[in-house]
Amino acid sequence: MSENPYRPTVRTQAELERAWRHLMEPLGFGGHSLWLMFIEPDGRVLPHLTQIEDAVRPPTGEEEASFVEFLRHLRDRLGSGGRLVFLRSRPGRGGPNPDDLAWARSLYAACRAAGMETDVVHLATDDTLVPLPMDVALAEPA
């Protein structure tokens, strides 16, 4: 008997947070990662989660430029209306620190530069999972 993959419909921020909670709980992380989830134009999540490990420091300008090219390639493959969403996970307790906010700023900027649709970036630590809205990320100094 095969198990059905997890494919929720994500149309709102609440649904996105619920999907991330389902995928990340129980919380507790041994390293810093960036997680990518693809959402189809109809809001259905693709049954594949991508993890980029060792994402400790926010990307440099050169790394962000490479990521923009990667996102452009994905945008072309996903087609119109698809979007890519992100969650940063790391060990430790509490809400966002300056590096988390720098990661969120970088992800928002890369998506904007690549023309890739995205939603609110999320952060998961050992004891919390929270959204990092663009206005909050941009309000913090670089």
Write out the residue ranges for each language-model feature.
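A structural signal for short coil/turn segments at secondary-structure junctions
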Residues: 31, 78-79, 114-115
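Bulky hydrophobic/aromatic packing residues
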Residues: 1, 53, 74, 78, ...
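Hydrophobic, Leu/Ile/Phe/Ala-enriched alpha-helical segments that form helix-helix packing faces
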Residues: 23-24, 71-75, 107-114
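Short beta-strand segments
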Residues: 37-39, 87-89, 122-124
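Residue-level recognition of the N-termini of beta-strands and the immediately preceding loop/turn
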Residues: 34, 82-84, 118-120
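Divalent-metal-activated hydrolytic enzyme cores
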Residues: 1-2, 100-142
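Short HxH-centered metal-ligating active-site micro-motif
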Residues: 57-98
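Domain-start "cap" segments at the beginnings of catalytic or binding domains
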Residues: 1-67, 128-142
